[in-house]
């Protein structure tokens, strides 16, 4: 069975209440339940992890090296600031898809730079909550083609 890790960064635990005009009304728990169901239907084990702390995200990536085949990451604000998360992802050699609910390239200038994009196998941005399912489809397709 393929094992995929979903990582959500800072403030994504506030989905459903935080700026619903940008991020929608679904909670992170709703998203995780829906995505886990889709993954299970495809015989994939999806592990979900959220942290507001950069070091915890780095630790999770490092701990996953032997058990996870692919990562989906919505690093939130860490997308634009975290070299340590970038280094952990690169060092892990686990293929990853960067995802964002909003289109980060159509927002404030500081959100247009990502420390992850050039190392990701792909990026999904701007499709609302559907960005999660699109990213899952993308990583499954990528990993399946590598078998």
From Swiss-Prot:
A biological process from GO: chorismate biosynthetic process
Annotated residues for binding of substrate: 74, 80, 87, 101-102, 111
Cell inner membrane as UniProt keyword: no
Cited function: Catalyzes a trans-dehydration via an enolate intermediate.
Subunit details: Homododecamer.
A Pfam family of this chain: DHquinase_II
Site, Transition state stabilizer: residue positions: 18
GO terms assigned for molecular function: 3-dehydroquinate dehydratase activity
Active site (record annotation): 23 (proton acceptor), 100 (proton donor)
Entry EC number(s): 4.2.1.10
HAMAP family, per database record: AroQ
Gene3D superfamilies linked: Dehydroquinase, class II (3.40.50.9100)
PANTHER family cross-referenced by the UniProt entry: CATABOLIC 3-DEHYDROQUINASE
Catalytic activity reported: 3-dehydroquinate = 3-dehydroshikimate + H2O
Protein name per its UniProtKB record: 3-dehydroquinate dehydratase
Gene that this sequence comes from: aroQ
Alphabetical UniProt keywords: Amino-acid biosynthesis, Aromatic amino acid biosynthesis, Lyase
Family membership noted in the UniProt record: Belongs to the type-II 3-dehydroquinase family.
């Amino acid at each position: 069975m393929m094992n995929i890790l979903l990582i959500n960064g800072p403030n994504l635990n506030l989905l459903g209440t935080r700026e619903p005009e940008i991020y929608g009304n679904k909670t992170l728990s709703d998203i995780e339940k829906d995505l886990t169901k889709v993954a299970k239907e495809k015989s994939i084990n999806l592990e979900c992890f959220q942290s507001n702390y950069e070091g915890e995200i780095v630790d999770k990536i490092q701990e996953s090296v032997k058990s996870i085949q692919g990562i989906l990451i919505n690093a939130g604000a860490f997308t634009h600031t975290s070299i340590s998360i970038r280094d952990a992802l690169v060092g892990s050699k686990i293929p990853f898809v960067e995802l964002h609910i909003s289109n980060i390239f159509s927002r404030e200038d500081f959100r247009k730079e990502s420390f992850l994009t050039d190392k990701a196998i792909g990026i999904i941005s701007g499709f609302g909550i559907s960005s999660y399912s699109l990213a899952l489809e993308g990583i499954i397709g990528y990993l399946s083609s590598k078998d």
